[in-house]
UniProtKB/Swiss-Prot annotation:
This is Translation initiation factor IF-2. Residues 560-562 are annotated as: G5. GTP binds at residues 424-431, 470-474, 524-527. Residues 449-453 are annotated as: G2. It comes from the Bacteria. Residues 63-74, 90-112, 184-209, 217-244 have a biased composition (Low complexity). It comes from Rhizobium etli (strain CIAT 652). It holds the Pfam family IF-2. One of the essential components for the initiation of protein synthesis. Protects formylmethionyl-tRNA from spontaneous hydrolysis and promotes its binding to the 30S ribosomal subunits. Also involved in the hydrolysis of GTP during the formation of the 70S ribosomal complex. Residues 1-327 are annotated as: Disordered.
Amino acid sequence: MTDSNDDKTLSVTGKKTLTLKPSGMSQGTVRQDMGRGRTKAVVVETRKRRPMRPEDEKPITPAAPAAPVRAAEPAPAPVQARPPQPTPAPRVHQPGSSQANQRPQQSYQPQRSNDRPRPVVLNHLSPEEMDARRRALAESQARDAQDAIRRAEEEKRRAAEEAIRKAAEAEEAARRAAEEAARQAEAPAAAEPAVAAAPAPVVTEARPTAPRPASPAPAARRPDGAGAPAAARPAPGAGAPAGARGRRDDEGDDDRGAARGGPARGRVVRPEPAKPVTTRPKTDDERRRGKLTITTADVDGEDTGRSRSLSAMRRRQEKFRRSQMQETREKISREVVLPETITIQELSQRMSERAVDVIKFLMKEGQMMKPGDVIDADLAELIAGEFGHTVKRVSESDVELGIFNIADVEGDRVSRPPVVTIMGHVDHGKTSLLDAIRHANVVAGEAGGITQHIGAYQVEQNGQKITFIDTPGHAAFTAMRARGAQATDIAILVVAADDSVMPQTIESINHAKAAGVPIIVAINKIDKHEADPQKVRNQLLQHEVFVESMGGETLDVEVSAKTGKNLDKLLEAVLLQAEILDLKANPNRTAEGTVIEAQLDRGRGSVATVLVQNGTLKPGQIIVAGDVWGRVRALVTDKGDHVKEAGPATPVEVLGLSGTPQAGDKFAVVESESRAREISEYRQRLARDKAAARQSGQRGSLEQMMTQMQSTGIKEFPLVIKGDVQGSIEAIAGALEKLGTDEVRARIVHSGAGGITESDISLAEASNAAIIGFNVRANAQARQFAERQGIEIRYYNIIYDLVDDVKAAMSGLLSPERRETFIGNAEILEVFNITKVGKVAGCRVVEGKVERGAGVRLIRNDVVVHEGKLKTLKRFKDEVSEVPMGQECGMAFENYEDMRVGDVIECFRVEHITRTL
């Protein structure tokens, strides 16, 4: 590249870098108007065509030296023509300028048109170089062929896109014409002024004519067609408006015609009047907008090379058609499920309406609400009806519908084993009898030899299975006995032949009658010498239990758990009673049943002993038990075996629950985790509401609390109870509740199944409570924390000891009993005023005696005036401890001197006696 066109030598300036341009390329810069007086230099490159045939090659005249410089200058305005250039001389066969501009290193050698460049023979090339040249030539030819194929495909694609665009434009024009015709047909009155004003836009004849230059600007049109580089011509749409581009396109056609050696399309170029270029005035927004976007590219129908997509055009047509035909979308009426309470936002979502519309309706009704406000079902039903929807009202309890008490087809029901509950008084041999039946030794594992848990077992007799439920007999386990009676088919009432009917025996009879289950009386301990079975039968008559031997319908069997006598007869009686009851269940359905017992095991987590009453329970199923749910991880029998399924009347331990359910809760299998979570959350809400209502009912206002404390003086003994199973905790809570009196009661701050943890210690510290562990222990961290905080932890494994210790501790909270003992009376004979001592009463003891330090009352006219203690008691001048009746003495009161002659002084002794519950 050189600084001037005259210098043909290859040189590099100090400020420019040496670059090689591809052949056939010319480059220039133009100035693009950016608006508001701003311009930008744009580099434009143009590729020239090569002559494909030797006869098409035209002799090219050299370009004027100043032409490239002027081409690079910015145009003064996009709508004005370039300054007129002198008409170039006729074409003469001169060296081609295009090659000279593109390859400045080649010298310009004049040659005639009939002279052809002779090939240069390179004799000094080696064979390897010749082969490389041939390979390069072959590769170049292959690339040219590929480029030609690519260009052909590109032309085809452009032609197809142009056809699609023209078809869309034709469709749009036809649609607009049809719409215009429809509007004119519908509104003939409005069409008349439009027709009258129609000729007004025709102003082409009134345009001022101006002589057009005979020769256009060289930059716009060149006679030789290749004199100036393409950089002098800016790209379409770069800096000129649409009008100027249209004119230049026409001039381009003339250029192509002139390039073929004559006027364009055989016409003589004559001067034409210059058409005024109409430019649309720019608005402020367009002046500020310097960025070209798709939205702003197609303005007022200008042909900028972009067009809307077919999808956008269809959407636009559909929208316009709706607006013309005034179509309204069909209102969809939906069935809206309304709970007892719902937020406005959720209601609008269920109706598929906007929350704003719902709020507007409420504002019209005079209610100002927000989308997050909660409304009741009545208002929600009114809103849904206003919006044209139907309503289905449900309650929160409907989430439990369809999971319990599902009716079965009679043909699907098959016989199932009976569920037998062993009930009776404590120490009457219930567990020993069950051990003899199961050939096990459960009694040895029970603390104190008494049953404190409810257990479920299954035995087999003559090929038939029997499920036994063992209940505690202690008075504290009333709830356990009630649960056992409700979940059973047959109740075995165990009565000791040497002890006859006892209070828990009567309670068990009442539970069985309340549950409506038949009773089988097992008279135990007949191996003892003092046993009297007939006495037991006679006592049962008092409680409306009529055995068969006494003319009734209740079966009775005399058994001995120690020797195993008549155990087979007892099992036969159970099977006979089960056959009479005709017990059936459907194993081919989802399982449901009752939680017998639940505990928190350290290694296995929450463990629930359940009795399947219907259906079949399998691992992997999702169950809901009370307010907890979980996926069954394993099923364990009473013998410790893992089973794959548990059918009707089968007791198993279930592992995998999210929490520890309450004993006595119903459980059922549900289809999904979402349903289980929904039921669990509903039951948890119910439990929280009940607890809050109970606490609020107990708490009341501060004034009520103070009044109650002053009037009743009830003291509370706070406790934190942790047990091994839920049933034991329930029994302990019930037993402690019975210890309460009008003055003191036990308040259970927290109770739960599982070991004692640090959180229990923190809770006990905050509430100043003692911690009781029943068959559980505290971990090392909890013990250390309790020692640091000074919290007492007591461990028990027998409920007797627990109740006795709590009873003694609660007795200490009772205010001691104040017992007053009369000592004697003295009459005041004279009152003396002694310096430094005060008033001293001279008295005579008229009844009993007077003791120093005892309590005294000053009685005047049979009214107690003062009550206090004696300060001094003297006989003559000596201090004495007591003065008997008939003697005189001097007495002075503490902090009281209003004594008069004739007053009576009563002396008494006060004793405080400790009370017990």
